[in-house]
């Protein structure tokens, strides 16, 4: 018999703003990969293709999904209560678009403000 303690249990995944709706527009294979990678994060395992995104904020990262097209999922996994999905988008050029970085940063800042106010589920 195995006992799962709270610290062993997967973290919740909380999607901020339109991140879930945006992710749902990904092609099926990219959605499956994103789902698996988010599941890995929830279990405390970093996905195989990710990179830190300090430009978004401390502890922010980017899941990279490659195929015929490139997709990205911005996340924060540093808080004990949940994995926060900040933004999901299709990458159309070599550099991440300024608007995607700014949106990720704005949602990260909103998350910090909500946590300071005791609300652990910002919108």
Give the label of every model feature segment.
Residues 74:
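Short, surface-exposed charged micro-motifs
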């Amino acid at each position: 018999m195995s006992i799962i303690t709270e610290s062993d249990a997967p973290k919740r995944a909380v999607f901020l703003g339109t991140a879930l709706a945006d992710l749902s527009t990904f092609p099926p294979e990219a959605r499956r990969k994103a789902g698996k990678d988010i599941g890995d994060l929830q279990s405390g395992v970093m996905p195989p293709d990710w990179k830190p995104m300090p430009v978004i904020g401390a502890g922010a990262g980017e899941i990279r999904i490659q195929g015929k097209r490139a997709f990205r999922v911005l996340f924060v996994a540093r808080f004990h209560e949940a994995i926060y999905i900040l933004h999901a988008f299709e990458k159309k050029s070599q550099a991440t678009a300024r608007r995607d970085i700014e949106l990720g940063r704005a949602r990260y800042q909103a998350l910090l403000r909500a946590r300071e106010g005791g609300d652990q589920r910002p919108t």
